[in-house]
Design a protein with these regions (language model features):
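A conserved mid-protein helix/loop that constitutes part of the nucleotide-sugar donor-binding site
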Residues: 16-21, 204, 209-223, 293
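Short hydrophobic beta-strand element within catalytic cores of glycosyltransferases
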Residues: 301-304, 314
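Nucleotide-sugar donor phosphate/pyrophosphate-binding loop at the beta->alpha transition
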Residues: 18, 71-78, 114-116, 124-151, ...
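N-terminal strand-loop element at the rim of the active site
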Residues: 8-72, 165, 177, 238-241
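Aromatic "clamp/platform" in nucleotide-sugar-dependent glycosyltransferases that forms part
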Residues: 265, 284
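Short His-centered aromatic/hydrophobic patch
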Residues: 94-100, 119
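Donor nucleotide-sugar binding/catalytic pocket of nucleotide-sugar-dependent glycosyltransferases
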Residues: 59, 142-192
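Glycosyltransferase donor-sugar binding loop
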Residues: 36-43, 205, 232-246, 262
Length: 316
């Protein structure tokens, strides 16, 4: 039976790079797919056209992705409610914290619609740290997740640690349906195996957040290059509005000191992976790190951390 499926995203980049295979599958099965993206990204015509060519319908909504302004978050909630009332989908899929929480809260007004939240990682509030701000955000997120997940038909996790933590914090109850999917998957046609290059190039690809282990990577680069100056440490990704972001001054210091080669925000992940010999992700916590899966598909040795999400990618 054909369904109308609404997918709520916090950014267009992840919708195209992480969900396009799922969207294509749903459309190939005969379902109608509407994608909801933040208003500020709605003008990215090239990216939107890629999904429109597959048959995706686009809508926009108000979202402050990393902000803590309650008025803006209330606008996100009302905006999602409005789109759902207009689209009248049969199924709503939301991923990342704010879309999951506010879509979940909206679902109490639409009891006949099935809601499937995807927990792709827990972010700043749930990583280790003793700061007052982090603790307050964590407590707020616990309360909001409890409210947002009440209306879910089934909750989809990407690793068992996140699921256990949600049980421990009583965010979800044992009788609530849930599944673990171990990541978003990688299209092996887009990330084929390639021979290792001869140059000793290490690559880290991530948003430039402290919680991603960017500082640890830079410090490791400094230590190694002091003894082996021909080794290259590349860093790719953007500065972010997240509370855990590093400063541009810190990034420029690493670049000027010569131990980090900064690639900026790259358009071709596959090309950068093909050029490196080792892939590194020293993250504090992930859902299931897509970049690690892509690196493995390409045939790159991976150095990552024994932390939730990351540990699932490695058989030790």
């Amino acid at each position: 039976m054909t369904k109308h499926i609404l997918i709520i995203s916090s950014e267009l980049f992840s919708l195209i790079n992480f969900r396009s295979s799922l969207i294509k599958y749903l459309i190939d099965c005969g379902h109608r797919v509407t994608a909801l993206v933040p208003k500020e990204e709605y003008n990215n015509e090239d990216s939107i056209q890629k999904l429109k060519s597959m048959g995706v319908i686009f809508k926009s909504y108000s979202l402050s992705r990393a902000g803590l302004n309650p008025f803006k978050d209330y606008l996100s909630y009302k905006s999602i409610c409005f789109v759902i009332s207009q689209c009248k989908p049969d199924i709503v899929i939301a991923y990342t914290a704010k879309p999951v929480i506010y879509a979940g809260m909206a679902m109490k007004h639409f009891p006949k619609i099935s809601f499937f939240p995807l927990i792709t990682g827990l972010g700043y509030g749930f990583t280790e740290g003793d700061g007052v701000k982090r603790k307050l955000i964590r407590q707020l997120m616990i309360i909001l997740y409890r409210k947002g997940l009440k209306s879910s038909e089934s909750i989809i996790f990407q690793n068992p640690d996140d699921k256990k933590l949600f049980y421990k914090l009583k965010i979800i109850l044992r009788n609530m349906s849930s599944h673990i999917v171990h990541g978003s998957g990688v299209d092996l046609d887009l990330y084929p195996f390639s021979p290792l290059p001869k140059k000793p190039i290490f690559l880290m690809l991530a948003r430039l957040l402290i919680d991603k282990g960017v500082r640890e990577y830079a410090e490791a680069a400094r230590i190694v290059k002091a003894q082996f100056p021909k080794v290259i440490f590349q860093l790719a990704g953007r500065l972010d509005s997240n509370p855990s972001t590093i400063s541009s001054n810190e990034l420029n210091f690493w670049i000027n000191e010569g131990f980090i080669q900064y690639l900026g925000e790259i358009s071709s992940v596959q090309k950068s992976l093909t050029s490196c010999r080792f892939y590194v992700l020293p993250s504090y916590r992930e859902g299931t790190p897509r970049s690690v899966l892509e690196a493995m598909a390409t045939g790159r040795p991976v150095i990552t951390t024994d932390t939730p999400g990351c540990r699932e990618t490695v058989i030790d």
